[in-house]
A protein has these predicted regions:
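Internal alpha-helical scaffold of NAD(P)-dependent oxidoreductase catalytic cores
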Residues: 103-113, 129-166, 179-216
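NAD(P)-dependent Rossmann-like dehydrogenase/reductase catalytic/cofactor-binding core
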Residues: 204-272
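NAD(P)+-binding Rossmann beta1-loop-alpha1 motif at the extreme N-terminus of oxidoreductases
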Residues: 1-57, 61, 127, 190-191
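Small-residue helix-packing motif on alpha-helices
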Residues: 29, 59, 195-202, 224
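Short acidic capping loops at alpha-helix termini that bridge into adjacent secondary structure
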Residues: 26-29, 88-90, 113, 197
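Rossmann-like NAD(P)(H) cofactor-binding subdomain of soluble oxidoreductases
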Residues: 36, 46, 55-132
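Short pre-catalytic strand/loop immediately N-terminal to key active-site residues, enriched for Gly-Thr
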Residues: 163-169, 221-226
Length: 272
């Protein structure tokens, strides 16, 4: 399969890395990336990959799938640059947050075979999760897009495009929440007198081990939490402080704020 990426940043690089690791020929992958340094890094990392600085008819010729991997505010210009040449392409995939299929279709001159996805940064190590939505009638496009994102992690499909705003807030932004709590646990360990290297190792191992335990268990997270918590014990003392501070409610509010921002971003882009 011939794949052309519009944008060659971290997420595009992660997807290319996943494809190559699964046996894809780098020579079947093209990337349009205006930054000279990033183009050089991509070509050095994936020998045979074809990289160029501009969106021209040549980079879409023969492509089975075009992947838009640019920032949301760059999407309109990027789409309009390739619009005269996109009609023969079997499928388009966008991973730009907030950019709705209808708007991308409009910028592409009415192109109808679009799949929209929200990946996350653990894709950089092949451990991402992406949620995809396909425009009505884009079943064939969905079949082309799915394996591209499966190359760097799990995938799920949603039936309603508006659900991607919630997905953006949960899994798209989710790694930042995890890193926030990881950072706090590490800082607490240091403030309790542990050496910095040991604090980091303990925090990382605790998160990694807890997730392995959760994924391998049939128990709900609440039950797993209760299993660690003895009445009047050390864990209970910590959780009492979190409850008194309303941490759970505030955290839920934070995720909802991210979802609202995703919706607002989509609304703003729709006006272009």
């Amino acid at each position: 399969m011939e794949v052309t990426f519009i944008g060659g940043g971290n997420m595009a690089s992660a997807i290319v890395g996943g494809l190559v690791a699964r046996g894809a020929d780098p020579g079947a992958i093209r990337i349009v990336e205006p930054q000279d340094g990033q183009r050089t890094r991509l070509v050095e990392r994936f020998p045979g990959l074809r990289a160029s600085s501009g969106s021209t008819a040549g980079v879409l010729a023969g492509a089975d799938l075009v992947v838009f991997a640019v920032k949301p505010q760059q999407m309109r210009a990027a789409a309009q640059a390739v619009a005269p040449h996109v009609a023969p392409v079997p499928a388009v995939l966008t991973i730009a947050a907030g950019v709705r299929c209808a708007d991308l279709s409009r910028w592409l001159g009415g192109y109808p075979r679009i799949v929209r996805a929200m990946p996350n940064t653990p894709a950089l190590v092949g451990a991402g999760i992406s949620v995809l939505y396909a425009m009505p009638g884009a079943t064939a496009a969905a079949k082309l897009a799915a394996p591209v994102l499966e190359a760097c992690g799990e995938i799920l499909w949603c039936e309603r495009e508006q659900d991607l705003d919630a997905v953006t807030a949960v899994s798209g932004s989710g790694p930042a929440y995890v890193f926030f709590f990881l950072e706090a646990l590490e800082q607490a360990a240091i403030e309790l007198g542990l050496p910095a290297a040991e604090a980091r190792r303990l925090a990382y191992a605790t998160f990694e081990g807890s997730m392995r335990l959760a994924r391998g268990s049939s128990e709900a997270p609440a039950t797993l939490r209760a299993n660690v918590t003895s009445k009047g014990g050390t864990t209970a003392a910590a959780l009492d402080v979190l409850d008194a501070g309303g941490v759970r409610a505030r955290f839920i509010d934070a995720v909802k704020a991210a979802a609202a921002r995703a919706t607002a971003l989509g609304d703003a882009l729709a006006k272009d």
